[in-house]
Design a protein with these regions (language model features):
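Surface-exposed alpha-helical segments enriched in charged/polar residues
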Residues: 81-85, 146-150, 294
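Conserved P-loop
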Residues: 10-98, 103-107
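Interfaces that engage single-stranded nucleic acids at replication/repair/recombination sites
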Residues: 3-24, 28-30, 71, 77, ...
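P-loop NTPase motor core
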Residues: 103-190
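Structured loop/turn residues at beta-strand edges in well-structured enzyme cores
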Residues: 91, 155, 197
Length: 331
């Protein structure tokens, strides 16, 4: 990997440059929001892709949605290769949603089991015993997830992860109190940490209900962009660049959703610009995103060519080459 010279960073301007992790209670409207987001932003359903994961098929009664299904990790790898290799050829997908990422965990665990059998030469029958057990299976799992979504981001294809929520009891290390409750995702803490680290926006949807005499009198749907002690949420924006939450009360929330995030990007800039300048930067930014996938493809082709040259060199000198020299060539 070639050294990249340092350069001054600049805040992104377009929602296409954001990786988004959305958690909420079931039937909140997460999948519908992604569908509406694609249509509002691009006016074309083929610009987005909804990936149903494992047993989750939350898109079967939504129309105007570009969708596919993955059943195992090989499907995930094939999907990633297709997204990167065929962008600008078979497709022009800008955003990819994974619904729900909780279903990816058992899929990834099965992949780790197969990897263990292949790499160690010993039959592995359970995830916890993979690669000798202890903490190694979890390390491999987290690495697999992180590398997958990071690869998409590097290629300029921003992932949109969807998950369910769960109230968890949190107790900090060294804290003698009983801890506190927080509304976060239903993933294990280490997997949740991976998505929290990778994604730019960690959003949480919930429903506030007022109950009187054992009956719900009112309910308000809210989508949180910033946490409040109980709600776990946050974005990589400047302070107060986005509201704590928006009321999620319209049949189509896409326009409001896009405005909040793109306004947040604009407010996060240290040097203020006009709306016209902002739109021009958005236009250039989208072009640069498309160039990223081209660079990934070029790097991959160069890597393949280099390996081929090494193999040809070994074949040509196999009869006279020493083992020490062979190691030097391969490294």
């Amino acid at each position: 990997m070639a050294f990249k010279k340092p350069q001054i960073t600049e805040v992104k301007t377009d929602i296409q440059s954001l990786s988004i992790y959305l958690r909420s209670v079931k039937k909140f409207g997460k999948t519908t929001l992604f569908r509406d987001l694609v249509l509002e932003k691009f006016g074309d359903p083929t610009k987005g892709l909804l990936v149903g994961c494992g047993a989750e098929m939350g898109y079967t009664i939504l129309d105007n949605l570009n969708a596919t299904q993955v059943e195992d990790w090989d499907d995930m790898e094939d999907l990633k290769d297709w997204l990167i290799e065929e962008k600008g050829k078979e497709h022009d997908i800008k955003m990819v949603a994974f619904d729900v990422v909780g279903e990816l965990i058992p899929i990834a665990e099965e992949k780790i089991i197969r990897m263990s059998t292949k790499e160690t030469g010993k039959v592995c029958k359970s995830f916890n015993s993979a690669f000798g057990g202890y903490g190694e299976p979890r390390k491999r799992l987290l690495k697999l997830l992180k590398e997958y979504f990071s690869a998409l981001k590097k290629a300029g294809i921003m992932p949109f992860a969807i998950s369910h929520t769960k109230v968890k009891s949190i107790k900090e290390k060294g804290d003698d109190t009983e801890g506190y409750n927080t509304l976060t995702s239903d993933l294990s803490n280490d997997c949740e940490g991976i998505f929290g680290d990778i994604f730019d926006c960690v959003l949480t949807g919930c429903i506030d209900r007022e109950v009187k005499d054992g009956k719900v009198t009112t309910e308000v749907r809210k989508l949180y962009f910033r946490g409040n002690g109980y709600i776990d949420a946050g974005c990589r924006f400047a302070n107060d660049a986005v509201p704590e939450y928006i009321v999620f009360d319209k049949p189509n929330m896409a326009k409001d959703f896009i405005k909040v995030l793109e306004d947040g990007l604009k407010k996060s800039r240290t040097n203020k610009i006009t709306d016209e300048e902002f739109k021009e930067k958005q236009r250039k930014e989208v072009i640069e995103l498309d160039k990223q996938v081209e660079q990934i493809r070029e790097n991959k082709e160069l890597s393949i060519e280099t390996k081929t040259e090494i193999i040809d060199k070994v074949k040509a000198n196999l009869s006279k080459i020493e083992i020490a020299d062979l190691k030097a060539i391969m490294t």
